[in-house]
């Protein structure tokens, strides 16, 4: 993997721009994940990984997941701890970042209709509660 050390690198500038600008995220159709758990959860998802960035120390800590992520991503880079701190939106950077492609769900919603959206319901009984509440509210 190639190592990026300078903050003026185009890849680093692009990731920082995605972090700070929702307009840029929508325009490019990309978003950034930060932190080991979020980034490595992508391994079990349908999201496409454009770029994977990791510090050498984080690579040692999460070696197995890092190898899998390098295979899943289109481009992978080592970054310095200093760059990781500069990129990070958190106080204590974990040194793991991924730039992923947004999914565009073209749902044909009809005006005047009512819809319920749920995500990751863990208890089937909760769906019944949601439906009953929606019915009660009209």
Residue ranges and their predicted role:
Residues 69-101:
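Glycine/small-residue-rich loop that forms an oxyanion/phosphate-binding "nest" at active or ligand-binding sites
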Residues 65-72, 133:
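Catalytic-core regions built around general acid/base machinery
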């Amino acid at each position: 993997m190639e190592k990026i050390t300078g903050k003026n690198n185009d890849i680093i500038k692009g990731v920082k721009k995605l972090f700070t600008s929702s307009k840029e995220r929508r325009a490019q159709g990309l978003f950034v994940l930060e932190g080991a758990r979020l980034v490595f959860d992508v391994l079990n998802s349908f999201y496409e990984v454009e770029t994977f960035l990791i510090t050498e120390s984080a690579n040692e800590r999460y070696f197995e997941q890092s190898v899998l992520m390098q295979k899943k991503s289109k481009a992978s880079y080592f970054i310095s701890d200093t760059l990781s701190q500069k990129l990070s939106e958190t106080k204590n950077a974990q040194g793991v970042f991924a730039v992923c492609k947004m999914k565009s769900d073209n749902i044909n919603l009809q005006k005047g209709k009512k819809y319920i959206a749920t995500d990751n319901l863990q208890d089937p009984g909760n769906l019944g509660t949601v439906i009953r509440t929606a019915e009660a509210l009209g």
